[in-house]
From Swiss-Prot:
Catalyzes the production of hydrogen sulfide (H2S) from cysteine. The modification N6-(pyridoxal phosphate)lysine is found at residue 270. Residues 7-36 have a biased composition (Low complexity). This is Putative L-cysteine desulfhydrase 2. InterPro entries: Aminotrans_V_dom, PyrdxlP-dep_Trfase, PyrdxlP-dep_Trfase_major.
Amino acid sequence: MASLQSGGDAAANGVDADVDGAASPPSAKRPRAGAGAAAITDAEVRAEFAHHDRAVARLNNGTFGCCPASVLAARARWQRLFLSQPDAFYFHHLQPGLARSRAAVAAAVGAGDASEVSLVDNVTTAAAIIMQHVAWSFAEGDFARGDVVLMFLYTYCSIKNSIHAYVARAGATVVEVPLPFPVSSPDAIVAEFRAALAVARDGGRRRVRLAVIDHITAMPTVLIPVKELVAICREEGVDKVFVDAAHAVGQVPVDVRDIGADFYASNLHKWFFCPSAVAFIHTRKDDPVSSKLHHPVVSSEYGNGLPMESAWIGVRDYSAQLVVPDVVDFVNRFDGGVEGIRRRNHDKVVEMGTMLAAAWGTFLGTPPEMCGSMLMVGLPGSLGVGSEDDAVGLRTMLRKQFKVEVPLYYNSKAAAADAPPEMVKDGNGDPVTGYVRISHQVYNVREEYEALRDAVAKLVADGFTCRKLRPPEKEETLA
Protein backbone atom coordinates (compact mmCIF):
# COMPACT_ATOMS: atom_id res chain seq x y z
CA MET A 1 0.00 0.00 0.00
CA ALA A 2 1.41 3.36 -0.99
CA SER A 3 1.83 5.93 1.77
CA LEU A 4 1.11 9.62 1.41
CA GLN A 5 4.29 11.41 0.35
CA SER A 6 2.99 14.92 0.84
CA GLY A 7 0.06 16.81 2.24
CA GLY A 8 -1.57 17.19 -1.15
CA ASP A 9 -3.83 14.14 -1.08
CA ALA A 10 -4.81 14.73 2.53
CA ALA A 11 -5.63 18.36 1.83
CA ALA A 12 -7.77 17.31 -1.10
CA ASN A 13 -9.77 15.17 1.29
CA GLY A 14 -10.33 18.04 3.68
CA VAL A 15 -7.80 16.94 6.33
CA ASP A 16 -4.48 18.32 7.45
CA ALA A 17 -1.12 16.60 7.05
CA ASP A 18 1.78 16.01 9.40
CA VAL A 19 5.29 16.85 8.27
CA ASP A 20 5.90 13.15 7.56
CA GLY A 21 2.94 13.08 5.20
CA ALA A 22 0.54 11.22 7.50
CA ALA A 23 -2.88 12.76 7.91
CA SER A 24 -3.41 14.62 11.18
CA PRO A 25 -6.55 15.30 13.22
CA PRO A 26 -8.90 17.74 11.51
CA SER A 27 -8.90 21.34 12.61
CA ALA A 28 -12.11 23.29 12.97
CA LYS A 29 -13.16 25.50 10.06
CA ARG A 30 -15.51 27.74 12.02
CA PRO A 31 -15.40 30.55 14.59
CA ARG A 32 -14.04 29.51 17.97
CA ALA A 33 -15.25 30.70 21.32
CA GLY A 34 -12.95 32.95 23.24
CA ALA A 35 -12.63 36.02 25.38
CA GLY A 36 -14.37 38.89 23.67
CA ALA A 37 -15.78 36.70 20.90
CA ALA A 38 -19.15 37.83 19.59
CA ALA A 39 -22.09 35.63 20.54
CA ILE A 40 -23.68 33.59 17.80
CA THR A 41 -26.41 35.48 15.94
CA ASP A 42 -29.92 34.31 15.13
CA ALA A 43 -28.96 34.13 11.46
CA GLU A 44 -25.99 31.92 12.31
CA VAL A 45 -28.20 29.64 14.39
CA ARG A 46 -30.60 29.29 11.46
CA ALA A 47 -27.67 28.47 9.18
CA GLU A 48 -26.37 25.85 11.60
CA PHE A 49 -29.71 24.02 11.39
CA ALA A 50 -30.63 24.76 7.78
CA HIS A 51 -30.67 21.01 7.13
CA HIS A 52 -33.86 20.70 9.21
CA ASP A 53 -37.11 20.38 7.26
CA ARG A 54 -38.53 23.91 7.49
CA ALA A 55 -42.01 22.69 6.60
CA VAL A 56 -42.26 20.81 9.90
CA ALA A 57 -42.80 22.26 13.37
CA ARG A 58 -40.08 20.26 15.12
CA LEU A 59 -41.13 20.03 18.76
CA ASN A 60 -39.44 16.73 19.57
CA ASN A 61 -35.79 17.38 20.24
CA GLY A 62 -35.81 14.76 22.98
CA THR A 63 -35.89 11.57 20.95
CA PHE A 64 -33.17 12.16 18.38
CA GLY A 65 -31.61 15.47 19.37
CA CYS A 66 -30.01 17.76 16.80
CA CYS A 67 -26.56 18.46 15.43
CA PRO A 68 -25.37 21.78 13.97
CA ALA A 69 -23.78 22.01 10.54
CA SER A 70 -20.38 23.01 11.92
CA VAL A 71 -20.21 19.86 14.03
CA LEU A 72 -21.42 17.73 11.13
CA ALA A 73 -18.60 19.22 9.07
CA ALA A 74 -16.08 18.33 11.79
CA ARG A 75 -17.46 14.81 11.82
CA ALA A 76 -17.06 14.57 8.04
CA ARG A 77 -13.42 15.64 8.36
CA TRP A 78 -12.78 12.80 10.82
CA GLN A 79 -14.50 10.38 8.46
CA ARG A 80 -12.35 11.55 5.54
CA LEU A 81 -9.26 11.26 7.72
CA PHE A 82 -10.06 7.61 8.32
CA LEU A 83 -10.81 6.96 4.66
CA SER A 84 -7.64 8.70 3.48
CA GLN A 85 -5.31 6.46 5.49
CA PRO A 86 -7.07 4.06 7.89
CA ASP A 87 -3.87 2.57 9.30
CA ALA A 88 -2.49 5.96 10.30
CA PHE A 89 -5.89 6.87 11.71
CA TYR A 90 -5.97 3.74 13.84
CA PHE A 91 -2.37 3.87 15.07
CA HIS A 92 -1.93 7.62 15.54
CA HIS A 93 -5.21 9.52 15.79
CA LEU A 94 -8.14 7.49 17.09
CA GLN A 95 -7.11 7.01 20.71
CA PRO A 96 -5.70 10.54 21.23
CA GLY A 97 -8.90 11.93 19.72
CA LEU A 98 -11.11 9.84 21.98
CA ALA A 99 -8.99 10.84 24.98
CA ARG A 100 -9.65 14.50 24.17
CA SER A 101 -13.38 13.77 24.00
CA ARG A 102 -13.34 11.94 27.34
CA ALA A 103 -11.52 14.88 28.90
CA ALA A 104 -14.12 17.29 27.50
CA VAL A 105 -16.95 15.18 28.93
CA ALA A 106 -15.24 14.88 32.31
CA ALA A 107 -14.88 18.65 32.52
CA ALA A 108 -18.50 19.20 31.51
CA VAL A 109 -20.05 16.85 34.09
CA GLY A 110 -17.76 17.27 37.10
CA ALA A 111 -15.98 13.93 36.87
CA GLY A 112 -12.78 13.46 38.86
CA ASP A 113 -10.76 12.95 35.69
CA ALA A 114 -11.10 11.52 32.21
CA SER A 115 -10.26 7.99 33.41
CA GLU A 116 -13.71 7.91 35.04
CA VAL A 117 -15.47 8.42 31.70
CA SER A 118 -16.16 5.82 29.02
CA LEU A 119 -17.68 6.74 25.66
CA VAL A 120 -20.38 4.45 24.29
CA ASP A 121 -23.05 4.71 21.63
CA ASN A 122 -26.01 5.45 23.89
CA VAL A 123 -27.45 4.94 27.36
CA THR A 124 -28.93 1.66 26.16
CA THR A 125 -25.36 0.39 25.74
CA ALA A 126 -24.38 1.79 29.14
CA ALA A 127 -27.30 -0.03 30.75
CA ALA A 128 -26.24 -3.30 29.11
CA ILE A 129 -22.75 -2.88 30.58
CA ILE A 130 -24.15 -2.40 34.07
CA MET A 131 -26.79 -5.12 33.85
CA GLN A 132 -24.22 -7.57 32.50
CA HIS A 133 -22.10 -6.93 35.59
CA VAL A 134 -25.08 -7.35 37.92
CA ALA A 135 -26.07 -10.59 36.16
CA TRP A 136 -22.54 -11.93 36.64
CA SER A 137 -22.79 -11.04 40.33
CA PHE A 138 -25.82 -13.31 40.58
CA ALA A 139 -24.23 -16.05 38.49
CA GLU A 140 -21.00 -16.03 40.52
CA GLY A 141 -22.82 -16.12 43.86
CA ASP A 142 -22.08 -12.58 45.03
CA PHE A 143 -25.83 -11.90 44.99
CA ALA A 144 -28.54 -14.34 46.08
CA ARG A 145 -31.53 -15.39 44.03
CA GLY A 146 -34.43 -13.14 45.00
CA ASP A 147 -32.28 -10.08 45.72
CA VAL A 148 -33.94 -6.96 44.33
CA VAL A 149 -33.43 -4.53 41.48
CA LEU A 150 -35.56 -1.40 41.91
CA MET A 151 -36.69 0.72 38.96
CA PHE A 152 -39.34 3.30 38.10
CA LEU A 153 -42.64 2.47 36.46
CA TYR A 154 -41.63 5.07 33.86
CA THR A 155 -38.11 3.70 33.34
CA TYR A 156 -37.44 3.74 29.59
CA CYS A 157 -38.46 0.55 27.80
CA SER A 158 -34.98 -0.42 26.58
CA ILE A 159 -33.60 -0.10 30.12
CA LYS A 160 -36.46 -2.19 31.47
CA ASN A 161 -35.78 -4.79 28.80
CA SER A 162 -32.10 -4.83 29.73
CA ILE A 163 -32.99 -5.40 33.37
CA HIS A 164 -35.20 -8.33 32.46
CA ALA A 165 -32.87 -9.75 29.79
CA TYR A 166 -29.80 -9.77 32.04
CA VAL A 167 -30.73 -9.46 35.69
CA ALA A 168 -34.17 -11.02 36.10
CA ARG A 169 -33.00 -14.07 34.15
CA ALA A 170 -30.06 -14.34 36.54
CA GLY A 171 -32.37 -14.53 39.55
CA ALA A 172 -33.22 -10.97 40.58
CA THR A 173 -36.62 -9.83 41.77
CA VAL A 174 -37.69 -6.63 40.01
CA VAL A 175 -39.71 -4.05 41.95
CA GLU A 176 -41.21 -0.97 40.29
CA VAL A 177 -41.72 2.46 41.85
CA PRO A 178 -45.26 3.57 40.82
CA LEU A 179 -44.64 7.26 40.21
CA PRO A 180 -47.71 9.51 40.00
CA PHE A 181 -48.54 11.71 37.02
CA PRO A 182 -49.44 14.50 36.76
CA VAL A 183 -47.36 15.47 39.74
CA SER A 184 -47.38 18.70 41.69
CA SER A 185 -44.19 18.46 43.76
CA PRO A 186 -40.99 16.43 44.19
CA ASP A 187 -42.29 15.30 47.58
CA ALA A 188 -44.77 12.96 45.89
CA ILE A 189 -41.92 11.22 44.07
CA VAL A 190 -39.82 10.93 47.22
CA ALA A 191 -42.76 9.43 49.12
CA GLU A 192 -43.45 6.83 46.42
CA PHE A 193 -39.76 5.95 46.23
CA ARG A 194 -39.49 5.41 49.98
CA ALA A 195 -42.63 3.26 49.95
CA ALA A 196 -41.38 1.12 47.07
CA LEU A 197 -37.99 0.73 48.72
CA ALA A 198 -39.69 -0.53 51.87
CA VAL A 199 -41.60 -3.10 49.79
CA ALA A 200 -38.39 -4.12 48.06
CA ARG A 201 -36.55 -4.65 51.35
CA ASP A 202 -39.47 -6.65 52.78
CA GLY A 203 -38.68 -5.78 56.35
CA GLY A 204 -34.99 -6.44 55.86
CA ARG A 205 -35.49 -9.94 54.48
CA ARG A 206 -34.29 -8.96 51.00
CA ARG A 207 -31.26 -7.04 49.79
CA VAL A 208 -31.68 -4.30 47.22
CA ARG A 209 -28.66 -4.79 44.99
CA LEU A 210 -29.34 -2.09 42.41
CA ALA A 211 -31.61 0.94 42.15
CA VAL A 212 -32.16 2.39 38.69
CA ILE A 213 -33.15 6.05 38.95
CA ASP A 214 -34.02 8.30 36.02
CA HIS A 215 -32.63 11.82 36.13
CA ILE A 216 -35.36 12.93 33.73
CA THR A 217 -38.02 10.42 32.76
CA ALA A 218 -38.69 10.24 29.04
CA MET A 219 -42.45 9.79 28.91
CA PRO A 220 -44.05 11.39 30.75
CA THR A 221 -41.12 13.73 31.19
CA VAL A 222 -40.46 14.64 34.83
CA LEU A 223 -37.30 16.01 36.41
CA ILE A 224 -36.57 13.64 39.29
CA PRO A 225 -34.97 14.79 42.60
CA VAL A 226 -32.12 12.44 41.80
CA LYS A 227 -29.60 13.57 44.41
CA GLU A 228 -32.16 13.10 47.20
CA LEU A 229 -33.11 9.63 45.96
CA VAL A 230 -29.46 8.58 45.76
CA ALA A 231 -29.01 9.75 49.36
CA ILE A 232 -32.05 7.69 50.41
CA CYS A 233 -30.51 4.64 48.75
CA ARG A 234 -27.33 5.16 50.76
CA GLU A 235 -29.32 5.47 53.98
CA GLU A 236 -31.26 2.28 53.25
CA GLY A 237 -28.27 0.15 52.32
CA VAL A 238 -28.86 -0.19 48.58
CA ASP A 239 -25.69 -1.70 47.14
CA LYS A 240 -25.41 0.25 43.89
CA VAL A 241 -27.25 3.10 42.17
CA PHE A 242 -27.44 3.60 38.41
CA VAL A 243 -28.75 6.96 37.21
CA ASP A 244 -30.24 6.76 33.74
CA ALA A 245 -29.64 10.32 32.63
CA ALA A 246 -30.36 9.84 28.93
CA HIS A 247 -31.89 13.32 28.65
CA ALA A 248 -29.89 15.17 31.29
CA VAL A 249 -26.68 16.66 29.85
CA GLY A 250 -27.67 19.90 28.16
CA GLN A 251 -31.07 20.04 29.88
CA VAL A 252 -30.07 20.37 33.53
CA PRO A 253 -26.83 21.07 35.42
CA VAL A 254 -24.91 17.83 35.96
CA ASP A 255 -22.24 17.23 38.60
CA VAL A 256 -21.74 13.48 38.79
CA ARG A 257 -19.61 13.62 41.92
CA ASP A 258 -22.20 15.71 43.73
CA ILE A 259 -25.05 13.40 42.67
CA GLY A 260 -23.09 10.50 44.09
CA ALA A 261 -24.39 7.55 42.06
CA ASP A 262 -22.18 4.55 41.37
CA PHE A 263 -23.03 4.65 37.66
CA TYR A 264 -24.22 7.70 35.74
CA ALA A 265 -24.89 7.60 32.00
CA SER A 266 -26.17 10.28 29.65
CA ASN A 267 -26.55 10.69 25.91
CA LEU A 268 -24.68 13.52 24.25
CA HIS A 269 -26.66 13.43 21.00
CA LYS A 270 -29.98 14.44 22.59
CA TRP A 271 -29.35 17.80 24.27
CA PHE A 272 -25.61 18.40 23.82
CA PHE A 273 -25.57 18.77 20.01
CA CYS A 274 -23.41 15.73 19.25
CA PRO A 275 -24.21 13.68 16.14
CA SER A 276 -25.77 10.28 16.64
CA ALA A 277 -24.72 8.35 18.46
CA VAL A 278 -22.56 9.08 21.48
CA ALA A 279 -23.07 8.81 25.23
CA PHE A 280 -20.90 8.38 28.30
CA ILE A 281 -20.90 6.28 31.42
CA HIS A 282 -19.24 7.60 34.58
CA THR A 283 -17.88 5.40 37.35
CA ARG A 284 -15.64 6.53 40.17
CA LYS A 285 -12.07 5.33 39.75
CA ASP A 286 -11.86 4.56 43.49
CA ASP A 287 -14.80 2.14 43.23
CA PRO A 288 -13.52 -1.46 42.87
CA VAL A 289 -16.52 -2.27 40.69
CA SER A 290 -15.23 0.05 37.96
CA SER A 291 -12.55 -2.50 37.09
CA LYS A 292 -15.20 -5.22 36.74
CA LEU A 293 -17.28 -3.49 34.09
CA HIS A 294 -16.86 -4.70 30.53
CA HIS A 295 -18.24 -3.68 27.18
CA PRO A 296 -20.61 -6.37 25.86
CA VAL A 297 -18.81 -6.24 22.50
CA VAL A 298 -15.56 -8.00 23.36
CA SER A 299 -12.53 -6.82 21.39
CA SER A 300 -8.75 -6.90 21.60
CA GLU A 301 -9.01 -4.27 24.38
CA TYR A 302 -10.80 -6.64 26.78
CA GLY A 303 -9.35 -6.35 30.27
CA ASN A 304 -7.77 -2.94 29.71
CA GLY A 305 -10.51 -1.06 31.56
CA LEU A 306 -13.90 0.10 30.38
CA PRO A 307 -12.68 3.38 28.81
CA MET A 308 -10.29 1.45 26.55
CA GLU A 309 -12.69 -1.43 25.91
CA SER A 310 -15.30 1.10 24.77
CA ALA A 311 -12.75 2.99 22.68
CA TRP A 312 -12.23 0.02 20.38
CA ILE A 313 -15.03 -2.43 19.63
CA GLY A 314 -13.81 -3.26 16.15
CA VAL A 315 -13.79 -1.39 12.86
CA ARG A 316 -16.63 1.11 12.80
CA ASP A 317 -17.31 4.84 12.49
CA TYR A 318 -16.02 6.55 15.66
CA SER A 319 -16.49 10.08 14.32
CA ALA A 320 -19.49 10.91 16.54
CA GLN A 321 -17.34 10.27 19.60
CA LEU A 322 -14.43 12.30 18.23
CA VAL A 323 -16.24 15.63 17.80
CA VAL A 324 -17.11 16.31 21.46
CA PRO A 325 -14.49 19.11 21.66
CA ASP A 326 -16.07 20.67 18.56
CA VAL A 327 -19.44 20.57 20.29
CA VAL A 328 -17.96 22.33 23.31
CA ASP A 329 -16.70 25.03 20.94
CA PHE A 330 -20.18 25.31 19.44
CA VAL A 331 -22.07 25.72 22.73
CA ASN A 332 -19.52 28.27 23.90
CA ARG A 333 -20.51 30.52 21.01
CA PHE A 334 -23.79 31.14 22.86
CA ASP A 335 -24.20 33.67 25.64
CA GLY A 336 -23.53 31.77 28.86
CA GLY A 337 -22.41 28.62 27.08
CA VAL A 338 -24.34 25.44 27.72
CA GLU A 339 -25.80 26.81 30.97
CA GLY A 340 -27.14 29.84 29.13
CA ILE A 341 -28.68 27.57 26.50
CA ARG A 342 -30.21 25.42 29.20
CA ARG A 343 -31.75 28.35 31.08
CA ARG A 344 -33.21 29.90 27.95
CA ASN A 345 -34.61 26.58 26.74
CA HIS A 346 -36.25 25.99 30.12
CA ASP A 347 -37.79 29.44 30.24
CA LYS A 348 -39.06 29.14 26.66
CA VAL A 349 -40.56 25.67 27.04
CA VAL A 350 -42.43 26.82 30.15
CA GLU A 351 -43.63 29.94 28.32
CA MET A 352 -44.81 27.91 25.31
CA GLY A 353 -46.37 25.21 27.47
CA THR A 354 -48.27 27.81 29.47
CA MET A 355 -49.49 29.39 26.23
CA LEU A 356 -50.74 26.02 24.94
CA ALA A 357 -52.44 25.11 28.22
CA ALA A 358 -54.23 28.46 28.32
CA ALA A 359 -55.41 28.06 24.72
CA TRP A 360 -56.70 24.53 25.32
CA GLY A 361 -58.11 25.06 28.81
CA THR A 362 -55.77 22.49 30.30
CA PHE A 363 -52.66 22.45 32.49
CA LEU A 364 -49.01 21.49 32.71
CA GLY A 365 -48.18 17.95 33.82
CA THR A 366 -45.54 19.21 36.26
CA PRO A 367 -44.68 22.52 37.89
CA PRO A 368 -41.96 24.44 36.00
CA GLU A 369 -39.28 23.48 38.52
CA MET A 370 -39.83 19.81 37.65
CA CYS A 371 -38.93 20.14 33.98
CA GLY A 372 -35.83 20.95 31.97
CA SER A 373 -36.24 21.70 28.27
CA MET A 374 -39.18 19.29 27.83
CA LEU A 375 -42.65 19.72 29.30
CA MET A 376 -45.93 17.81 29.38
CA VAL A 377 -49.06 19.76 28.41
CA GLY A 378 -52.55 18.33 28.78
CA LEU A 379 -54.71 17.98 25.66
CA PRO A 380 -58.41 18.85 25.67
CA GLY A 381 -60.38 15.93 27.08
CA SER A 382 -62.83 16.07 24.17
CA LEU A 383 -60.17 14.51 21.92
CA GLY A 384 -60.82 11.27 23.77
CA VAL A 385 -57.32 9.82 23.95
CA GLY A 386 -58.22 6.41 25.37
CA SER A 387 -55.21 4.20 24.67
CA GLU A 388 -51.61 4.17 23.54
CA ASP A 389 -52.87 3.37 20.04
CA ASP A 390 -54.96 6.53 20.15
CA ALA A 391 -51.90 8.55 21.14
CA VAL A 392 -49.89 7.10 18.25
CA GLY A 393 -52.74 7.71 15.82
CA LEU A 394 -53.22 11.32 16.89
CA ARG A 395 -49.49 11.95 16.71
CA THR A 396 -49.44 10.54 13.18
CA MET A 397 -52.35 12.81 12.21
CA LEU A 398 -50.54 15.86 13.57
CA ARG A 399 -47.45 14.90 11.58
CA LYS A 400 -49.13 14.10 8.27
CA GLN A 401 -52.03 16.54 8.24
CA PHE A 402 -50.61 19.50 10.16
CA LYS A 403 -46.82 19.08 9.77
CA VAL A 404 -46.30 19.13 13.53
CA GLU A 405 -43.91 16.63 15.12
CA VAL A 406 -44.62 16.15 18.80
CA PRO A 407 -44.77 13.04 21.02
CA LEU A 408 -48.10 12.15 22.64
CA TYR A 409 -48.71 10.34 25.90
CA TYR A 410 -51.76 8.42 27.07
CA ASN A 411 -52.07 8.59 30.84
CA SER A 412 -53.87 5.61 32.30
CA LYS A 413 -52.55 6.19 35.82
CA ALA A 414 -53.94 8.27 38.65
CA ALA A 415 -52.57 11.68 39.50
CA ALA A 416 -50.68 12.21 42.73
CA ALA A 417 -52.89 12.20 45.80
CA ASP A 418 -51.99 15.82 46.48
CA ALA A 419 -52.58 16.92 42.87
CA PRO A 420 -55.10 19.78 42.78
CA PRO A 421 -58.38 19.24 40.87
CA GLU A 422 -57.22 21.57 38.10
CA MET A 423 -54.54 18.96 37.25
CA VAL A 424 -57.15 16.28 36.54
CA LYS A 425 -59.83 17.82 34.29
CA ASP A 426 -59.83 20.52 31.63
CA GLY A 427 -61.82 23.75 31.68
CA ASN A 428 -64.89 21.97 30.34
CA GLY A 429 -64.80 19.35 33.07
CA ASP A 430 -63.54 16.55 30.80
CA PRO A 431 -60.87 14.21 32.21
CA VAL A 432 -57.47 14.85 30.64
CA THR A 433 -55.97 11.57 29.46
CA GLY A 434 -53.74 12.77 26.63
CA TYR A 435 -50.63 14.93 26.79
CA VAL A 436 -48.11 16.35 24.36
CA ARG A 437 -44.45 16.44 25.29
CA ILE A 438 -43.06 19.64 23.86
CA SER A 439 -39.40 20.55 23.83
CA HIS A 440 -37.40 23.68 23.15
CA GLN A 441 -33.96 23.87 21.57
CA VAL A 442 -32.02 26.79 20.14
CA TYR A 443 -33.54 26.37 16.66
CA ASN A 444 -37.19 26.56 17.78
CA VAL A 445 -39.41 29.60 17.18
CA ARG A 446 -42.79 30.60 18.57
CA GLU A 447 -44.59 29.95 15.28
CA GLU A 448 -43.96 26.21 15.66
CA TYR A 449 -45.84 26.09 18.96
CA GLU A 450 -48.61 28.20 17.49
CA ALA A 451 -48.92 25.62 14.70
CA LEU A 452 -49.49 22.94 17.34
CA ARG A 453 -51.91 25.18 19.23
CA ASP A 454 -53.96 25.87 16.11
CA ALA A 455 -53.94 22.25 14.94
CA VAL A 456 -55.42 21.02 18.21
CA ALA A 457 -57.91 23.90 18.29
CA LYS A 458 -59.08 22.97 14.79
CA LEU A 459 -59.52 19.32 15.75
CA VAL A 460 -61.61 20.33 18.76
CA ALA A 461 -63.67 22.80 16.72
CA ASP A 462 -64.31 20.12 14.09
CA GLY A 463 -65.60 17.72 16.74
CA PHE A 464 -62.75 15.27 16.18
CA THR A 465 -62.27 12.43 18.65
CA CYS A 466 -59.83 9.53 18.62
CA ARG A 467 -62.77 7.20 18.05
CA LYS A 468 -62.48 8.17 14.40
CA LEU A 469 -58.97 6.70 14.29
CA ARG A 470 -59.97 3.31 15.63
CA PRO A 471 -60.89 0.34 13.47
CA PRO A 472 -64.41 -0.97 14.20
CA GLU A 473 -63.18 -3.99 16.16
CA LYS A 474 -60.97 -1.78 18.35
CA GLU A 475 -63.86 0.60 18.97
CA GLU A 476 -66.01 -2.26 20.26
CA THR A 477 -63.39 -3.27 22.83
CA LEU A 478 -63.13 0.28 24.15
CA ALA A 479 -66.85 0.99 24.24
